Amino acid sequence: MFLLHEYDIFWAFLMISSVIPILAFLISGVLAPIREGPEKLSSYESGIEPMGDAWLQFRIRYYMFALVFVVFDVETVFLYPWAMSFDVLGVSAFIEALIFVLIPIVGSVYAWRKGALEWS
């Protein structure tokens, strides 16, 4: 009753897909020339030498807006398949999707009222 042989193709694929990236890293490490100089160690921004320090600290507001964008973007990705099969799913799926949409909206309203989305 030991059915491990049924997964031979899976194990072969897993081994091959693990060996190829390892070989690529090893071969590039052996063949690539390692030359460090002042030009390679300097920072580079769109073909122009940077003015001032290359490390800037961003305000936390940027991260808040990025986080809100990612939440609603992921929500859109999850809602798209639901919208494509809406006619087949029925009322219970509609209620579940409504709850799924309302949770981030309630969170956004809460953050808005607390002033987390204010730019001042």
Curated annotation (Swiss-Prot):
GO terms for molecular function: NADH dehydrogenase (ubiquinone) activity; quinone binding. NDH shuttles electrons from NAD(P)H:plastoquinone, via FMN and iron-sulfur (Fe-S) centers, to quinones in the photosynthetic chain and possibly in a chloroplast respiratory chain. The immediate electron acceptor for the enzyme in this species is believed to be plastoquinone. Couples the redox reaction to proton translocation, and thus conserves the redox energy in a proton gradient. The keyword Glycoprotein does not apply. GO terms for cellular component: chloroplast thylakoid membrane; NADH dehydrogenase complex. The lineage of its organism: Eukaryota, Viridiplantae, Streptophyta, Embryophyta, Tracheophyta. Its main location: plastid. This is NAD(P)H-quinone oxidoreductase subunit 3, chloroplastic. Its EC number is 7.1.1.-. The keyword Transferase does not apply. GO terms for biological process: photosynthesis, light reaction. Keywords: Chloroplast, Membrane, NAD, NADP, Plastid, Plastoquinone, Quinone, Thylakoid, Translocase, Transmembrane, Transmembrane helix, Transport. It catalyses: a plastoquinone + NADH + (n+1) H(+)(in) = a plastoquinol + NAD(+) + n H(+)(out); a plastoquinone + NADPH + (n+1) H(+)(in) = a plastoquinol + NADP(+) + n H(+)(out). NDH is composed of at least 16 different subunits, 5 of which are encoded in the nucleus. It is a multi-pass membrane protein. Gene3D superfamilies: NADH:ubiquinone/plastoquinone oxidoreductase, chain 3.
